[in-house]
Amino acid sequence: MDKKAARIRRATRARRKLQELGATRLVVHRTPRHIYAQVIAPNGSETLVAASTTEKAINEQLKYTGNKEAAAAVGKAIAERALEKGIKDVSFDRSGFQYHGRVQALADAAREAGLQF
C-alpha cells in the first residue's frame, strides 16, 4: 500500500464514523502549494462554507500559500464564514493527514476565531 492509498483509507474510515454521528464536518485538504477547508452538512451532500488559499482575497495577503501562515489565514476565514451562517460546532475531518504543521495551524486558527471542535 502506498502513502496516498493509506491516507485515503484513514480518511474513509474517519468519514464513515462522522457520518454515523450526523455531525457537521470541517474538512481539510492540503497540497504542497495550497490548503483548502470546507464545512459540509451532516448529510454530506452540501457544502455550507468554503475557504482556500486559491481565493484572491486570502491569496493577496500572503507571500506564499503553502506554509503555516497561509493555513492559519484559511482557518480564520473559514471560522468567520461559518459563524456568519450560524455554525458554531463542527467535527474536524483531517482527511487522513497528520495533525501536525499546516493542518494543526488551520485547526488552531479556526478555534481561536470561534469554532468549537
Curated annotation (Swiss-Prot):
Keyword Transit peptide listed: no
CDD domains: Ribosomal_L18_L5e
A Gene Ontology BP annotation from the UniProt entry: translation
MF (Gene Ontology): 5S rRNA binding; structural constituent of ribosome
Subunit structure: Part of the 50S ribosomal subunit; part of the 5S rRNA/L5/L18/L25 subcomplex. Contacts the 5S and 23S rRNAs.
Function description: This is one of the proteins that bind and probably mediate the attachment of the 5S RNA into the large ribosomal subunit, where it forms part of the central protuberance.
Similarity-based family: Belongs to the universal ribosomal protein uL18 family.
Name of protein: Large ribosomal subunit protein uL18
Organism name: Photorhabdus laumondii subsp. laumondii (strain DSM 15139 / CIP 105565 / TT01)
Gene name of the record: rplR
